Amino acid sequence: MSYKNIYYSDKYTDEHFEYRHVMLPKELAKQVPKTHLMSEEEWRRLGVQQSLGWVHYMIHEPEPHILLFRRPLPKDQQK
C-alpha cells in the first residue's frame, strides 16, 4: 500500500541518535494505534518507507499523525 501524501522530514542528530519525523495524511493517521509504539512491521504496513534500523520511539499526543523515529548513530559518529 503506497500513499503519496506521506511527508518525511530531513534527518537531524544529537550525540547518540539520528532522528526524523513522518507526517501521515488524516485517513492514514486513523490507523495508528493509540496504545503502543508501532513495530517496524506495523509502520511499514501503513506505507511508511525508510531504511532499516528506524524505531518508532515516541507518541506525540497532540499530533498523533506525526510519527517520531530514531536510530542509533554509528559508534564513530557519536560525540
UniProtKB/Swiss-Prot annotation:
**TM stretches of this protein:** none
**Record InterPro entries:** Cyclin-dep_kinase_reg-sub (IPR000789), Cyclin-dep_kinase_reg-sub_sf (IPR036858)
A molecular function annotated in GO for this UniProt entry is:
cyclin-dependent protein serine/threonine kinase activator activity
SUPFAM superfamilies, alphabetized: Cell cycle regulatory proteins (SSF55637)
* GO process annotations (BP): cell division; regulation of mitotic cell cycle
Q: Which PROSITE patterns match?
A: CKS_1 (PS00944), CKS_2 (PS00945)
Q: Which UniProt keywords apply?
A: Cell cycle, Cell division
Pfam annotation, one family: CKS
A single GO CC term for this protein reads: cyclin-dependent protein kinase holoenzyme complex
Q: Which family does it belong to?
A: Belongs to the CKS family.
Quaternary form?
A: Forms a homohexamer that can probably bind six kinase subunits.
Function comment: Binds to the catalytic subunit of the cyclin dependent kinases and is essential for their biological function.
Q: What is this protein called?
A: Cyclin-dependent kinases regulatory subunit 2
- What species does this protein belong to? Xenopus laevis
- Gene coding for it: cks2
